[in-house]
Amino acid sequence: DEAIRCTGTKDCYIPCRYITGCFNSRCINKSCKCYGCT
């Protein structure tokens, strides 16, 4: 599983939406954490 690099949470919205179908995500330690749909 490739880490998605980020400088801020907004960098994660599009890639996480692509992966999980939802924007719910955060940028932690310069990589994205995708939470999927809640």
From Swiss-Prot:
GO terms under cellular component: extracellular region
GO molecular function: ion channel inhibitor activity; toxin activity
SS bond list: 6-27, 12-32, 16-34, 22-37
Gene3D superfamilies: Knottin, scorpion toxin-like
InterPro entries membership: Scorpion_toxin-like_sf, Scorpion_toxinS_K_inh
A Pfam short name: Toxin_2
Main location, first listed in the record: secreted
Family named by the database record: Belongs to the short scorpion toxin superfamily. Potassium channel inhibitor family. Alpha-KTx 06 subfamily.
Free-text note on domains in this protein's UniProt record: Has the structural arrangement of an alpha-helix connected to a beta-sheet by disulfide bonds (CSalpha/beta).
Stated name of the protein: Potassium channel toxin alpha-KTx 6.5
